[in-house]
Amino acid sequence: TGLGYDYTQFRNAFGSSIDRVDYLGGATFATNENSGKRQGITLGNYCNIDITDTINSSEFYNYAIQDPLYMHEYGHTIDGRKRGFAYLFTVGIPSVISAKNSHNIGRLRPSHSYEPYKRRANRLAAKYFSKNYGVNWFSPYPNSNSPWTIADYYPL
């Protein structure tokens, strides 16, 4: 958690700006809105997320339970709680390397999405958000007219 806090503070001071900070399920979500890209990195209870749009100030809860990126990053928080300090070496560092070397597979996902630790985060998120918020990972992608499901973009 200390490393996640430090990374979030460093990111806000010297990297991309953090436009809002929200809390859900014991995790801190530091969001950079209108960033031009959608990506996230989670260390401990700190989920640092870049999004291409904005979140209405009073609607973070609804936004988070409808945006699979937020749910996926929360899955990493759950995984980190289970793995403790080993998370940094078994998930964190390998994930940074995988993301850097990722390439597209088909129309929906980069190769990074298929890494075991990414899929484990998706499974943990699917279980948590299904149990606590009624989210169905196999329903159509939220806020979209697409037939694709969350699982199509965030494989289990």
Identify what each model region corresponds to.
Residues 74-93:
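Catalytic Zn2+-binding segment of zinc metalloproteases
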Residues 54-55, 75, 128:
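Short, solvent-exposed loop/turn segments at secondary-structure junctions
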Residues 1-11, 15-17, 26-38, 42-44, ...:
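Metalloprotease/metallohydrolase-associated module, dominated by Zn2+-dependent proteases
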Residues 35-40, 47-71:
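Short pre-active-site segment immediately N-terminal to the catalytic Zn-binding motif
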Residues 62, 84-85, 104-108:
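Alpha-helix capping and helix-coil boundary motifs
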